[in-house]
Structures are given as C-alpha cells and as structure tokens.
From Swiss-Prot:
One of its GO terms (biological process) is translation. Part of the 30S ribosomal subunit. Forms a loose heterodimer with protein S19. Forms two bridges to the 50S subunit in the 70S ribosome. Residues 96-122 are annotated as: Disordered. This is Small ribosomal subunit protein uS13. Residues 101-122 have a biased composition (Basic residues). Keywords: Ribonucleoprotein, Ribosomal protein, RNA-binding, rRNA-binding, tRNA-binding. Belongs to the universal ribosomal protein uS13 family.
Length: 122
C-alpha cells in the first residue's frame, strides 16, 4: 500500500481510483492530478515508483487542500457562519437541513430519531 500524505491508498486498484480514497479528491481532481504529473491513470497504485510517490506528495501538499486541512477548513467555515448568526449557521446549530429542503416531513437524517408527542385531546 503506497502512503500518500499520510494515507494508505489501495495498492491493487487503478491509480485514478486509489487517489479518490484521500479526503478532498474526487474522480475529476484525481484525473487532473494524474495529468499534471504525467502518470498512467490505468496503472495500479502498487506500480508507482518512490520518485512518483514523492512527486505526488509534493504536489498535494503544495497545491491542494486535502485531508486534515480541508476538514479543519470546513469546520471553521461552519463555526464562522454560526458566530456571525447567518441563516445557514443557525440551521447548522439547530441540526436542520441547511440548503432549503422541506422539514414538515422528511429530513430524518438531520433531525434524528422521531420524538413522540402526545396526540390532540378530543
């Protein structure tokens, strides 16, 4: 298993798929990185040489925000929205959907398990 920026990527999968195991790298960004380094996207990750792994590490650390840095940035953005009392921040704070979805029904993932309330008296 090659280790890239502290993450073990699957050795038996193709390079274009293996890179997507790094948080912040999807299929499109994976293709872009491979093209920039002129690597073979169909080659297996185990076939990478030490020099290629080094180039990959250097590129990811210098030009891209991935893994821990990206997670920290997302969390700090959410904290900032909460502290400035933005609408999106309030939705995050209340654990409700942020992007305008309906909440009368659905949104169980965000709200959590149903809280049973006593029915209306006749």
């Amino acid at each position: 298993m090659p280790r890239i920026i502290g993450i073990d990527i699957p050795a038996k999968k193709k390079l274009k798929i293996s890179l997507t195991y790094i948080y912040g790298i999807g299929p499109a960004l994976s293709k872009e990185i491979i093209a920039r380094l002129q690597l073979n996207p169909e080659a297996r990750a185990a076939e990478l040489t030490e020099e290629e792994v080094g180039r990959l590490n250097a590129l990811l650390q210098s030009d891209y925000v991935v893994e821990g840095d990206l997670r920290r940035r997302v969390q700090s953005d959410i904290k900032r929205l909460i502290t400035i009392h933005a609408y999106r921040g309030q939705r995050h704070r209340l654990s409700l959907p942020v992007r305008g979805q309906r909440t009368k029904t659905n949104s169980r993932t965000r709200k959590g398990k149903r809280k049973t309330i006593a029915g209306k008296k006749k």
